[in-house]
C-alpha cells in the first residue's frame, strides 16, 4: 500500500527545487535560477518549517507539552496557519490573535485546525505599527491573560525560526544541488 505517515509533521521539508529556464532566457542570464517549491509543505508554505521547529525545539527543552500548554501567537499570515496545523497534529491548544481584515477562507481554515481565534484591541495592534517589534510584548501579554500555561511562539524573535533553515532548508538545497548552489 505504499508509505503511510503517522502525522503531517513527518511531511515538512524535502520540497522540490525547479529551475526557471524561461525566466533565465527572458532575462538573458548566464547563470541558473531555481526555486524551492515550499507550497508542497503540509500547511502550504515555508512557514511550516519554522513553526514545527519552534514547537519541537521547545518540546526538547521541556518548555511545553500537549497535556498542559497552550501555544500563543499574534499573526494573520502563513505562520498562523502552520502553527495551527502542527498544534492540532501534536495535540496542543493554540490561541491566535488576528488583525482585522483576515479573509473568511483563512478564518475557516484556522477554525478547522481548532485554533482559538482571539480578537485583539485595535489600540494594541496600532502600537505594533508605531513602536515596532517591542510592542508585540503588549499584544502577547493581552492574549495570554486567562490562559493556563501559555507559551508564546514569538516567531519574530525566536531563534528557532532561523534555526529551522540552518538545520533543514539550507542542507536540503545543498543536497538537492549536489553542493553546487551559489548565491
Label each PLM-derived region with a short phrase.
Residues 1-183:
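PLP-dependent amino-acid enzyme catalytic core
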Amino acid at each position: 500500500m505504499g508509505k503511510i505517515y503517522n502525522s503531517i509533521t513527518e511531511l515538512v521539508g524535502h520540497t522540490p527545487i525547479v529551475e526557471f529556464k524561461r525566466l533565465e532566457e527572458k532575462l538573458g542570464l548566464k547563470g541558473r535560477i531555481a526555486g524551492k517549491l515550499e507550497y508542497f509543505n503540509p500547511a502550504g508554505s515555508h512557514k511550516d518549517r519554522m513553526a514545527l521547529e519552534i514547537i519541537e525545539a521547545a518540546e526538547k527543552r521541556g518548555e511545553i507539552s500537549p497535556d498542559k500548554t497552550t501555544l500563543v501567537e499574534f499573526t494573520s499570515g502563513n505562520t498562523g496557519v502552520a502553527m495551527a496545523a502542527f498544534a492540532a497534529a501534536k495535540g496542543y491548544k493554540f490561541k491566535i490573535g488576528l488583525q482585522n481584515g483576515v479573509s473568511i477562507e483563512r478564518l475557516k481554515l484556522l477554525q478547522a485546525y481548532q485554533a482559538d481565534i482571539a480578537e485583539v484591541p485595535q489600540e494594541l495592534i496600532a502600537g505594533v505599527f508605531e513602536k515596532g517589534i517591542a510592542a508585540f510584548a503588549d499584544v502577547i501579554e493581552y492574549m495570554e491573560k486567562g490562559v493556563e500555561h501559555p507559551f508564546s511562539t514569538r516567531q519574530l524573535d525566536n531563534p528557532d525560526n532561523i534555526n529551522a533553515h540552518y538545520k533543514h532548508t539550507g542542507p536540503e538545497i545543498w543536497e538537492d544541488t549536489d553542493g553546487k548552489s551559489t548565491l
